[in-house]
C-alpha cells in the first residue's frame, strides 16, 4: 500500500467516510435546550426563525475541518468524506446546512431522521466512523457493529 497516495497495489482508491451528528459539528446546546424544555413544536419554530443565523463550531468541528483539509493536501478530492447524520428534519436542518456553507465545509451528503437516532444510517453510507455528542447514539452505533 502506498501510504502517501492511499492506494493499494491494484490502484483501488481508499476512502475514509465519517458520519457526524449535527450536535458534534456545531454548538446546538441552546436549541437542544429548547427541544428538551419546550418540545418539538417550539424547537421547530426556534430553528426555522433562526435558519440564517450561523451556528458556532461544536466539539468535533476542528477535527472535521482538518480531515477535510487532507483532501486538498493530498491533491485529490474525495479521500475523506464527511456525512451529516442529524436528528433534525429537513426543514429544521436548513440552519445546519446554511452553517456548513458559511464555514466552507465540503459536506454534501446528509440524512435527516426527524427525531430518530441517526446511528442507523452509518451503515447505509458505508461510514467507517460515527462522531456524536450523544453517548446513547454512540453506544447504539457500536452495538449495531458500526
Describe each PLM feature range.
Residues 1-146:
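HAD-like aspartate-dependent phosphatase fold
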Amino acid at each position: 500500500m502506498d501510504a502517501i497516495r492511499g492506494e493499494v497495489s491494484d490502484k483501488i482508491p481508499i476512502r475514509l467516510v465519517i458520519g457526524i451528528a449535527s450536535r458534534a459539528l456545531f454548538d446546538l446546546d441552546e436549541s437542544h435546550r429548547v427541544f428538551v424544555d419546550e418540545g418539538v413544536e417550539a424547537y421547530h419554530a426556534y430553528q426555522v426563525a433562526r435558519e440564517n443565523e450561523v451556528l458556532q463550531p461544536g466539539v468535533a468541528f476542528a477535527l472535521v475541518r482538518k480531515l477535510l483539509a487532507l483532501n486538498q493536501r493530498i491533491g485529490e478530492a474525495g479521500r475523506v468524506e464527511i456525512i451529516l447524520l442529524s436528528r433534525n428534519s429537513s426543514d429544521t436542518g436548513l440552519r445546519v446546512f446554511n452553517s456548513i456553507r458559511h464555514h466552507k465545509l465540503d459536506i454534501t451528503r446528509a440524512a435527516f431522521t426527524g427525531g430518530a437516532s441517526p446511528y442507523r444510517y452509518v451503515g447505509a453510507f458505508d461510514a467507517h466512523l460515527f462522531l456524536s455528542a450523544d453517548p446513547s447514539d454512540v453506544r447504539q452505533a457500536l452495538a449495531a457493529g458500526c
